[in-house]
Amino acid sequence: MPGQKIETGHEDIVHDVQMDYYGKRIATASSDCTIKITGVSNNGGSQQLATLTGHRGPVWEVAWAHPKYGSILASCSYDGQVILWKEGNQNQWTQDHVFTDHKSSVNSIAWAPHDIGLSLACGSSDGNISVFTARADGGWDTSRIDQAHPVGVTSVSWAPATAPGALVSSGLLDPVYKLASGGCDNTVKVWKLANGSWKMDCFPALQKHTDWVRDVAWAPNLGLPKSTIASGSQDGKVIIWTVGKEGEQWEGKVLKDFMTPVWRVSWSLTGNLLAVSDGNNNVTVWKEAVDGEWEQVTAVEP
C-alpha cells in the first residue's frame, strides 16, 4: 500500500495527524508548539493552509469536531492547556476557548459522537479526565473523573452513541455516554455517565498489559451485539477487549505481541479493521476472521 508524502512544514517531531470529516484537510500536532493545517487532494498534491500558534509546549494531539458544529479543531499540549480553534473566513483560525483545568500535560483529547452533543474528553498526566460540554449560550459545562489513573492518563476514547445490539432491538434507546481510558498504571478503564457524574463501569479495571497503555480505541459497533475496545501498550502488545451485555465482564485477548512499543490503534469507520502503528515505524492493518482469530490483511509502507 504505497503512501503519499505530505510536507507539513513542522520544525520538530509530529505527534499526531488527523484528517477532517471531508478528507480534504489534515491537522498536525508537533513538538515545535504549533498546529498546521494542510490541504490534500486525491492527485497527491498538498498545500499548507494555516499555522496555529498559542501553545507553550509540545502539542500532543488534535481533534476535529463534527462539521454540524462548524469548523472547530481542538488541541492539547504539554503546557496543560486545551485550545479550541474556530475557522471564520476560509483558513482564518482564531482561539475560541482555552481550557486550563489541568495542572500537568494534557495527553489525549476526543470528541464525543456528534449525536450526543459537542463534548470533549481530555486525559492528563495529573491523573484526571475532564469532559467539556458546550451549552446553548456559548459557555461550557465541565464534568470530571478525578484520579481516573492516579499516575497519569495517556488516552481517552468515546463509546459509540448507540448501544450494542441496537439494530436488532426495537423501540427508542437512550444514547450511550461511556468512555474508555488508558493510563500509566498499565490498565484500561471504562466509565459511564449516570445522573450527572462519571462512575467506573468495569470491575475490576482491565489488566493484561505490563507497561503503560499508550492508546485505547473504542470500535464503532454498527448495532452489533457486543462492545469492543482495542488497547496498545509500551509492552508491545495489542489487546482486544470485548463484552456482550451490560454488566458482564470484559474479556481480553492478545491480538499480537509486536516486540516494540505500540503507539496508536485506530478502527475503520465500520469497526471491522484495526490499524496499529508501532515503534519500528510499521503500520499494519488487522481483521477478525470467522473463527475469532485476528489476521493481518495489509501493511503500510513507511
Curated annotation (Swiss-Prot):
Belongs to the WD repeat SEC13 family. SMART domains: WD40. One of its GO terms (molecular function) is structural molecule activity. Required for protein transport from the endoplasmic reticulum to the Golgi apparatus. It holds the Pfam family WD40. SUPFAM superfamilies: WD40 repeat-like. The gene is SEC13B. It comes from Arabidopsis thaliana (Mouse-ear cress). This is Protein transport protein SEC13 homolog B. One of its GO terms (cellular component) is nucleolus.
